[in-house]
């Protein structure tokens, strides 16, 4: 006979930070009666989700990869941004074997060194100082033809802010006497993660064929031309800068993004012999190196290997015979699976996964509810099945709509999530289950840039909510994302592994 389980559900409201009420605060100004009542009736506090508390440099805003990794690990996990930056300051970066080998082979054959990545100081997917260091490394190794392919941000940075980074690159070329920016394209095309191969194809054709609708004599001129076409950084269409310079056989290609989820698709176009996303007109045989490990099935060498996290929440639950479900939309599916499991692709024993397809719209302000209704239906069904001990669910709306910078849409996104939370809590009460509600980082609570007065599309470094909907309890003040997993295990009356250095925050009365 199957024993009915009383599930503990962790709801992660992506991009939902806490900020005192302001006119541009979509979270506070949204009509959220469910969450308002939960905060009134149940134990709750705020958690730190940025900076050193999640393994990032002081003051650095959190992000979804970092947030989910810390939540799932139950400990502060020092992030790739921190590791790579330290290796540059220590000098170890310039002796990195995989980078050096690729560059040296290209130099010996008189070929080019291509450096591509998100040209941004945002620190979420990349950092422009890492690209500068790669330019320096190539120059030190004797490269005479260093070509930078700049993917423009405007999502983790202000919408029209790329000029500073492009000027930084120009200064470095002038200082070294070698190198130039060869192409520009917005991250909308180069960094898709939802199998929108028509977008990726445009970036790939720019890189491998120098195929573009636009040209310019300099990177800054190309950027200004894009702005004149009313294209913000994220959406800049493929642009060739100066003499066309496509990636060719024998060249070295260094992909300088450190975050995996939005780097995988473009990497597959270069490295997967069975690639079928689109017909590739050119498939150059290159020395391709990624900055970090993007996926188990990517064969290209990585300059920095991933830290193996043992006894994450998912692994610990599996080892103790517990069942678990991970569920989200396409946009955050990798976060509740791969990142939550500490970079492990495969499911643990007793772990099921449910993927709900995100809507096919150009930008999510066009459909701020995204696929939350279908997601909630599947989640409620899973709760009522009493099959699972633990369910991890991510609602992407606050983050994905917050990134558009459209305030009214962000308000609607928050209201949609609130309605869904109400249905989840009602289902849990039917089966005597419990719920923890939190976020991985902030976003929608700040929609106007206080400096420029323009729209704010980036994450914030503000705290996030933590609500316990369950038994009568007290909540400790303070806390970090890494405290969530130990808190969950404590609520389940389970031992906490030694590797989890987070602190349980809830005391049952």
Curated annotation (Swiss-Prot):
CDD domains with a match to the protein in the record: iPGM
Q: Catalytic residues per the record?
A: 64 (phosphoserine intermediate)
GO function terms (MF aspect): manganese ion binding; phosphoglycerate mutase activity
Q: Where does Mn(2+) 1 bind?
A: 399, 403, 459
Query: Which pathway is this protein engaged in?
Result: Carbohydrate degradation; glycolysis; pyruvate from D-glyceraldehyde 3-phosphate: step 3/5
Q: State the protein's purpose.
A: Catalyzes the interconversion of 2-phosphoglycerate and 3-phosphoglycerate.
Please report the name of this protein according to its UniProt entry.
2,3-bisphosphoglycerate-independent phosphoglycerate mutase
Gene of this entry: gpmI
